[in-house]
A protein has these predicted regions:
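TOPRIM fold recognition
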Residues: 5, 92-188
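Sterically constrained small-residue positions within well-ordered secondary structures
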Residues: 25-27, 81, 119
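Catalytic phosphate/metal-binding cores of nucleic-acid and nucleotide-processing enzymes, i.e., regions
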Residues: 53-73, 78-81, 85-110, 117
């Protein structure tokens, strides 16, 4: 299941293994299951990823519990996505593009009742990384009016995959240039 996620969504196996070691990701009936937790770490429900790439939740009415991961340090900002894959993709994009991002919590939610609203209202920055025309984005913005909306034309996971492919292409080109230069060296 982890290798499927690594291939299908270009998520690093190291990250998936880390999530698995904390029981935040596991296999259930050959499907990927992401744990929805409170900020205190109490497991409340699960996001189940089906073979078509759609998420369902086991207990959709759970309040103030979401799939989340955070970078180290005292949390200064939050990024809210519409599911665990999107949340992890944004984390990876930000780590790839900036080594100096503030300590951030990345949340994957299905509905606004899953948000730790009071906690989010106390943060310096909250980013809603959900398609702005979606019902969910509008509901989150109504709940957190000071939040910033950051939507994209495609999914965050698609953006992550494009970033990885560009990086691999650049690496391949650099290797070809290196091999060409090696061939030009005379060792007489």
């Amino acid at each position: 299941m982890r290798s499927h996620l690594a291939v299908e969504y270009s998520l690093p196996l190291e990250l998936l293994n880390l999530l698995h070691s904390h029981s935040w990701l596991y296999a259930g009936s050959e499907k990927a299951v992401f744990t929805g937790r409170t900020l205190e770490g109490e497991a409340r429900f699960a996001f189940v990823l089906d073979e078509r790439g759609n998420f369902t939740t086991t207990h959709p009415l759970s309040s103030e519990a979401a799939f989340w991961v955070a970078t180290t340090g005292e949390i200064e900002r939050a990024v809210i996505a519409c599911n665990p894959i999107e949340a992890l993709s944004i984390l990876l994009i930000e780590q790839e593009n900036s080594a100096t991002a503030p300590a951030t919590i990345y949340l994957g939610i299905e509905r606004t009742s899953q948000l730790p609203t009071q906690f989010l209202q106390e943060l310096d920055s909250v980013i809603i990384a959900i398609a702005e025309d979606s019902h969910l984005a509008r509901n989150v913005l109504a709940l957190l009016p000071n939040a910033e909306l950051a939507s994209s034309q495609s999914s965050w996971n698609d953006i992550w995959i494009q970033l990885i492919e560009q990086k691999q292409q650049t690496h391949k080109q650099n290797n070809q240039q290196y091999k060409q230069r090696i061939q030009e060296i005379e060792l007489d």
